[in-house]
């Protein structure tokens, strides 16, 4: 959706989403995901997010459509995202 420049000059490819989302087509492409989490924004590499929500890869949606998203991630997921929340 957009490119962001890190303070060190690195360009980040960012997909802006309305909810936490993983997508098979983003794997290995150095894409970052940006989405709201309980009143804050999260910016995280997609492949790191994929590791955090690895159980989602066992869902029918992931297997058939190649994507999965959740409007309200559970407490464990939110805790795992803490290092990626921005203010």
Locations of regions flagged by a protein language model:
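Mixed-charge (Asp/Glu-Lys/Arg
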Residues: 3-87
């Amino acid at each position: 959706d957009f490119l962001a420049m890190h303070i060190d000059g690195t360009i980040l490819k960012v997909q802006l989403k309305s909810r936490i989302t993983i997508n098979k087509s983003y794997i290995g492409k150095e894409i970052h995901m940006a989405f709201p989490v309980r009143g804050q924004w999260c910016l995280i590499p997609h492949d790191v997010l994929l590791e955090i929500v690895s159980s989602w890869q066992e869902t029918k949606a992931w297997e058939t459509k190649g994507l999965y998203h959740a409007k309200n991630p559970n407490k464990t997921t939110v805790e795992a995202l803490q290092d990626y929340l921005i203010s």
